[in-house]
Amino acid sequence: MSRGNQRDVDRARNLKKSQASKKKQAGDPTKRLEAQAEIMRAKQRAADERKAAEANGGSKGKK
């Protein structure tokens, strides 16, 4: 019994499906959002400190 190109079609379909699943983010969404929020808060804190230092006339940051 011959399957024709069904095997090749299935391989291509499975490859496409596996690539799509790799793009999907793994893990608990709540924990991921909290971690991302903490990173953004740290970045914002650093930016605020840099702006305050520039306003005071000091230049600790990049020129």
UniProtKB/Swiss-Prot annotation:
Pfam families referenced in this protein's UniProt entry, alphabetically: SERF-like_N
Residue ranges, compositional bias (Basic residues): 14-24
Positions with biased composition (Basic and acidic residues): 1-13, 25-35
Residue intervals passing through the bilayer: none
Record's keyword terms, sorted: Cytoplasm, Nucleus
Subcellular location: Cytoplasm; Nucleus, Nucleolus
Disordered: region residues: 1-63
InterPro entries referenced in this protein's UniProt entry, alphabetically: SERF-like_N (IPR007513)
GO cellular component, one term: nucleolus
Chief location: cytoplasm
Protein name: SERF-like protein C1705.02
Native species: Schizosaccharomyces pombe (strain 972 / ATCC 24843) (Fission yeast)
